[in-house]
């Protein structure tokens, strides 16, 4: 399905439901009530859908969280913030998440949203090895299904499951 048609459909639906659409760019802050997100990208000078991916940074309960959208290596920030939780860019593509970026962000937990047996081979071995080299614990939706993180003053608790939490639950705790 054509991505531009999906966007047009979403905009039409938002208009129909009277939902306001706002454009964010680097330097903006988004307040959702529970969290305040710093918008790190897109930068105005970037072109292309992936290059203009929304990149958000927030902190909660002492945990630093960086969400990178589909940001390619060519558009990575020169000085990315250190983070405890990283949503890995572009499903772990070879065109995203450089070794240098990971050395600067040093995530403890890396989340990869990716479909099982996808035709692109995501996530790539290079990205998985780079995440391993910085000591990140990797959670992948193709292997674990839904990934839920709970943040508390005691640390981060992760639960993953494909079907039901009672049958396939895996819990892990981290202290940032």
Regions found by a protein language model. Give the residues of each.
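Non-globular, low-confidence helical/coil segments that flank catalytic cores
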Residues: 1-176
């Amino acid at each position: 399905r054509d991505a531009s048609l999906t966007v047009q459909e979403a905009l039409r639906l938002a208009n129909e439901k009277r939902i306001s659409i706002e454009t964010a760019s680097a330097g903006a802050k988004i307040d959702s009530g529970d969290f305040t997100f710093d918008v790190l990208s897109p930068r105005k000078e970037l072109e292309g859908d992936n290059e203009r991916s929304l990149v958000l940074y927030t902190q909660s309960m002492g945990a630093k969280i960086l969400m990178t959208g589909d940001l390619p290596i060519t558009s990575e920030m020169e000085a990315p913030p250190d983070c405890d939780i990283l949503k890995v860019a572009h499903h772990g593509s070879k065109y995203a998440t450089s070794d240098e970026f990971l050395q600067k962000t040093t995530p403890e937990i890396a989340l990869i949203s990716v479909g099982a047996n996808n035709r692109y081979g995501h996530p790539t071995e290079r990205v998985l090895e780079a995440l391993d080299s910085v000591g990140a614990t990797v959670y992948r939706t193709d292997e674990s299904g839904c990934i839920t993180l709970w943040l508390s003053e005691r640390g981060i608790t992760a639960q993953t499951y494909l079907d039901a939490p009672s049958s396939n639950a895996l819990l892990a705790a981290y202290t940032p």
